[in-house]
Design a protein with these regions (language model features):
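Anionic-ligand binding patches
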Residues: 2-7, 13-201
Length: 201
């Protein structure tokens, strides 16, 4: 049986850990694009899915391997859905989780509605011109709190309070996070799609 290799169109170590944990039981080897010399892809679009598709096609084009991209972010109700697709660069360049979190907390000062949700979109393509990309979505409801809590996770996790758990995303174990999170939900949906559409069971 041919080896199942999948390029992850990201150099984020946290994401790589989550992807490997999900796909290893399926016998899929997840390779970060940086290991294969893939250049950064522009993300010029205003929707998660368009940016995701662009990144997946770019990685497939540069590696000749099936590729998967993730585009995700936190969408805050009181800010009209911001940071949204701009989550990674909310406070500008260079990308900084600390600066992004400071800006988000600042923008929510004095607001009583602190509801937010994480969105994750995953796209997988067999090759750069794949006419049938696989698409999976995941969502995670929560609130933005004013102070950080927890040592795990990355991005906005220390400020993303999950009422159902009574703690922030950064306070959850890796197992809890994979079970509850937007990315965990999207990864499970994608795993089912890979098995059904590509035969990667």
């Amino acid at each position: 049986m041919a080896e199942k290799k999948l390029v992850l169109a990201s150099n984020n170590a946290g994401k790589l850990r989550e992807f490997r944990a999900m796909f290893a039981p399926m016998g899929v080897t997840v390779l970060p694009q940086g290991e294969l010399g893939v250049s950064e892809c522009a993300e010029p679009f205003e929707t998660f899915i368009e940016n995701c598709l662009a990144k997946a096609r770019h990685a497939a084009r540069e590696t000749g391997l099936p590729s998967m991209a993730d585009d995700s972010g936190v969408c805050v109700d009181a800010l009209g859905g911001l940071p949204g697709v701009h989550s990674a660069r909310f406070a500008g360049e260079p990308k900084s989780d600390a600066a992004n979190n400071r800006l988000l907390v600042e923008k929510l000062k004095g607001k009583t509605d602190r509801r937010a949700h994480y969105t994750c979109v995953l796209v997988a393509v067999r090759h750069p011109d794949d006419p049938e990309p696989l698409v999976a979505y995941g969502f995670w409801e929560g609130e933005i709190q004013e102070t950080p809590e927890g040592e795990g996770g990355f991005g906005y996790d220390p400020y993303f309070y999950v009422p159902a758990c009574g703690k922030t995303a950064a306070s959850l174990s890796a197992e809890e996070k994979n079970r509850l999170s937007h990315r965990g939900a999207a990864l499970r949906e994608m795993a089912a799609l890979l098995a059904k559409r590509w035969g990667w069971a």
